[in-house]
Amino acid sequence: DCAKEGEVCSWGKKCCDLDNFYCPMEFIPHCKKYKPYVPVTTNCAKEGEVCGWGSKCCHGLDCPLAFIPYCEKYRGRND
Protein backbone atom coordinates (compact mmCIF):
# COMPACT_ATOMS: atom_id res chain seq x y z
CA ASP A 1 0.00 0.00 0.00
CA CYS A 2 1.34 3.42 -0.87
CA ALA A 3 0.25 7.04 -0.74
CA LYS A 4 -0.54 9.18 -3.78
CA GLU A 5 -0.08 12.96 -4.09
CA GLY A 6 -1.77 14.75 -1.20
CA GLU A 7 -2.41 11.53 0.71
CA VAL A 8 -1.01 10.93 4.18
CA CYS A 9 2.36 9.20 4.13
CA SER A 10 4.79 7.88 6.77
CA TRP A 11 3.40 5.61 9.49
CA GLY A 12 4.79 2.80 7.36
CA LYS A 13 3.19 4.13 4.18
CA LYS A 14 5.53 5.50 1.52
CA CYS A 15 4.67 7.72 -1.41
CA CYS A 16 3.91 5.61 -4.49
CA ASP A 17 6.10 7.58 -6.89
CA LEU A 18 9.29 8.15 -4.90
CA ASP A 19 11.05 9.58 -7.94
CA ASN A 20 8.68 12.53 -8.10
CA PHE A 21 7.20 12.75 -4.60
CA TYR A 22 8.56 13.00 -1.08
CA CYS A 23 7.10 12.67 2.40
CA PRO A 24 7.89 15.84 4.39
CA MET A 25 8.82 15.52 8.05
CA GLU A 26 5.59 16.83 9.54
CA PHE A 27 3.22 15.70 12.27
CA ILE A 28 0.74 14.55 9.63
CA PRO A 29 2.74 14.46 6.38
CA HIS A 30 1.19 14.26 2.94
CA CYS A 31 3.05 13.27 -0.24
CA LYS A 32 4.43 16.36 -1.94
CA LYS A 33 5.77 16.69 -5.46
CA TYR A 34 9.44 17.59 -5.84
CA LYS A 35 10.02 20.80 -7.71
CA PRO A 36 12.54 20.24 -10.48
CA TYR A 37 16.07 21.06 -9.39
CA VAL A 38 17.19 24.38 -10.74
CA PRO A 39 20.51 26.02 -9.98
CA VAL A 40 20.12 28.48 -7.15
CA THR A 41 20.69 31.96 -8.53
CA THR A 42 19.38 33.97 -5.59
CA ASN A 43 21.92 32.38 -3.20
CA CYS A 44 19.11 30.57 -1.45
CA ALA A 45 16.95 27.55 -2.24
CA LYS A 46 13.16 27.89 -2.29
CA GLU A 47 10.58 25.45 -0.93
CA GLY A 48 10.95 22.06 -2.61
CA GLU A 49 14.40 22.87 -4.02
CA VAL A 50 17.53 20.96 -3.04
CA CYS A 51 19.48 22.47 -0.18
CA GLY A 52 22.67 21.51 1.57
CA TRP A 53 25.45 20.89 -0.97
CA GLY A 54 26.44 24.55 -0.63
CA SER A 55 23.00 26.10 -1.01
CA LYS A 56 21.03 27.41 1.94
CA CYS A 57 17.27 27.68 2.15
CA CYS A 58 15.62 31.07 1.77
CA HIS A 59 14.23 32.80 4.86
CA GLY A 60 11.54 30.86 6.67
CA LEU A 61 12.55 27.50 5.20
CA ASP A 62 14.35 24.62 6.87
CA CYS A 63 16.83 22.18 5.31
CA PRO A 64 16.00 18.75 6.76
CA LEU A 65 18.68 16.18 7.50
CA ALA A 66 18.29 13.85 4.56
CA PHE A 67 20.48 12.29 1.88
CA ILE A 68 18.99 14.68 -0.66
CA PRO A 69 17.36 17.43 1.42
CA TYR A 70 14.70 19.73 0.05
CA CYS A 71 13.77 23.03 1.69
CA GLU A 72 10.55 22.90 3.65
CA LYS A 73 8.62 25.36 5.82
CA TYR A 74 9.69 25.72 9.44
CA ARG A 75 7.36 24.03 11.88
CA GLY A 76 6.60 25.32 15.34
CA ARG A 77 8.86 28.33 14.96
CA ASN A 78 7.95 31.87 14.05
CA ASP A 79 10.76 34.12 12.96
From Swiss-Prot:
Changing residue 65 to A: Important decrease in activation of TRPV1 (in K2 synthetic construct). It comes from the Eukaryota. Belongs to the neurotoxin 23 family. Double-knot toxin subfamily. Interacts with TRPV1 (2 toxins (4 moieties) bind 1 channel (homotetramer)). GO terms for molecular function: ion channel regulator activity; lipid binding; toxin activity. Domain repeats lie at residues 2-31, 42-71. It comes from Cyriopagopus schmidti. This is Tau-theraphotoxin-Hs1a. The record marks 11, 27, 53, 67 as: Interacts with TRPV1 (reaches into the void formed by S4, S6 and pore-helix). Residues 2-71 are annotated as: 2 X approximate repeats with cysteine pattern C-C-CC-C-C. The presence of 'disulfide through disulfide knots' structurally defines this protein as a knottin. This toxin contains 2 'disulfide through disulfide knots' that are separated by a short linker. Bivalence accounts for irreversible toxin action. Disulfide bonds join 2-16, 9-23, 15-31, 44-58, 51-63, 57-71. Keywords: Disulfide bond, Ion channel impairing toxin, Knottin, Lipid-binding, Repeat, Secreted, Toxin. The keyword Electron transport does not apply. Expressed by the venom gland. The record marks 25, 65 as: Important residue for activation of TRPV1. The lineage of its organism: Eukaryota, Metazoa, Ecdysozoa, Arthropoda, Chelicerata.
